[in-house]
Design a protein with these regions (language model features):
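Extracellular leucine-rich repeat
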Residues: 2-425
């Protein structure tokens, strides 16, 4: 009897251990992919280590809370290591010393707060480092120094405080082309934060608590930059015409969801390669007459969700504009033959979104006739008779005078209100 009991107990223990470990499978003799076991797990030597054929290891969401020394020993061909979506709080100095061929390291969505100096000293071939979604609040000077080949760095959704960042942290990584600081507090970052970069292409500063376009993002060495993302900040003014003078290569400028009210008419003119400007969800009431004039590559302008009443064709004169979005503004009319005039002044308008707006019905009628005649794509689906799209007085003609705007806007808001109430009733 005694003997049987012991055997059962031992068996159960073995089972429990077996289930705690992630399960790993090897594909094409070189790609190891693991899935989580039933409990949290400390990675140790033996699970994925000791195989010189392995080139890739995926330990995504494997409930790993710690990595023991030697876990990656004898992986002399390893170039790809995905440790994302685990619960790692610390990486001990030396744990990633072994796989010297490593070029891709994904540590995103863990609970890392900082790194011991020297952690990356042996993985000098690293090209991509994804640290998104941790709690990193400190980057010690020198931590990235061995990473001279670094190309892609994602630091988004961490607890970085820009004003405490040392501007020399990237000094030995001048070839970074992509860097993402979004969802960190980057207000007050040093002006020379990115001074070492020689070929940056994409800079993401979404949700960084910025009150103005930060000067570290517009320095002369950033003339290679193609995308600058400044969305969801608290930028209110763009009034210095020299702001973007250095950004010769910029193709996309995203200023979505700020509180921009005024824009200097010449601020975009240095951006000769700009293709797309996103200004949606700001609070612009007027748009300067020259703002997008003579921009040789400009094809998309999104002004959705502002408070514009007047938009003149002059704003876009000499630019090959294809897509324009004026939806959700305070527009009751546009100038006569707006689209034709756009085309006559260099525009190539193909897609034009203008609903909702507090349109005067007669003006909307003219515009709809025009877009249909010219074969321009518009928000067709919105005109299904299911909700109010315009307002009119007894007199059905388009009044192109600003002093009537207030009246039509009020009428439209009233109609919308009635419509909403009747639907909820
Ligand atoms: C892997 O290669 C190294 C040197 O190239 C060798 O010393 C080691 O024994 C090999 N390990 C395995 C598990 O084959
Ligand atoms: C890193 O892992 C996350 C989550 O598993 C994934 O969404 C992301 O695309 C990976 N990053 C890169 C650069 O491949
Ligand atoms: C505005 O219109 C453009 C096409 O002209 C479209 O690509 C974009 O998504 C629109 N923006 C919004 C917020 O709907």
């Amino acid at each position: 009897m005694m003997v049987t009991y012991t055997t059962v107990a031992v068996l159960i223990t073995i089972f429990a251990i077996a289930e705690a470990k992630p399960k790993c499978k090897t594909f094409s003799q070189k790609d190891v992919v693991c899935t989580a076991g039933k409990t949290d797990y400390q990675l140790v030597r033996g699970l994925v280590s000791d195989n010189n054929k392995t080139t890739g290891i995926t330990l995504r969401a494997c409930r790993i809370y710690d990595i023991e020394y030697e876990s990656f020993n004898d992986l002399n061909s390893l170039s790809y290591l995905d440790l994302s979506q685990n619960k790692i709080q610390n990486l001990k100095l030396g744990v990633i010393d072994e796989p010297k061929q490593l070029s891709y390291l994904n540590l995103s969505y863990n609970q890392l707060t900082e790194f011991p100096l020297g952690l990356f000293d042996q993985v000098t071939k690293l090209d991509l480092l994804d640290l998104r979604g941790n709690k990193i609040n400190k980057l010690e000077l020198g931590i990235f120094d061995p990473l001279t080949k670094l190309n892609f760095v994602d630091l988004s959704s961490n607890a970085l405080v820009g004003k405490d960042l040392n501007p020399y942290i990237f000094d030995q990584s001048p070839h970074i082309t992509f860097i993402d600081f979004s969802r960190n507090n980057m207000e007050g970052s040093p002006d020379n934060l990115l001074h070492a970069f020689q070929s940056l292409q994409i800079l993401n500063l979404d949700r960084c608590f910025l009150k103005e376009v930060p000067s570290f993002a517009t320095k002369p060495n950033l003339g290679t930059m193609k995308h600058l993302i400044l969305s969801t900040n608290q930028i209110s003014k763009l009034d210095n015409p020299a702001t973007f003078v250095n950004l010769d290569s910029l193709e996309l400028l995203d200023l979505t969801a700020n509180v921009i009210e005024t824009i200097n008419p010449n601020i975009f003119s240095p951006l000769k390669n700009l293709q797309k400007v996103d200004l949606k969800n700001n609070i612009m009431k007027t748009i300067p007459d020259d703002l997008f004039r003579n921009m040789p590559k400009l094809i998309s302008v999104d002004l959705y969700g502002n408070q514009l009443e007047e938009v003149s064709v002059n704003v876009f004169r000499g630019s090959p504009l294809k897509n324009l979005n004026l939806s959700s503004n305070r527009i009751t009319y546009l100038q006569d033959n707006f689209c034709l005039e756009l085309r006559n002044s260099g525009g190539k308008i193909k897609k034009f979104l203008f609903d909702p707006n507090p349109w005067q019905c007669a003006c909307l009628h003219d515009l709809l006739k025009e877009v249909k005649r010219l074969g321009i794509e518009y928000n067709k689906g919105k005109y299904d008779g299911k909700r109010p799209v315009c307002v009119t007085t007894a007199e059905f003609n388009c009044k192109r005078q600003q002093n009537f705007n207030e009246m039509y806007i009020d009428m439209f808001n009233d109609v919308k209100e009635i419509h909403r109430n009747s639907r909820s009733a």
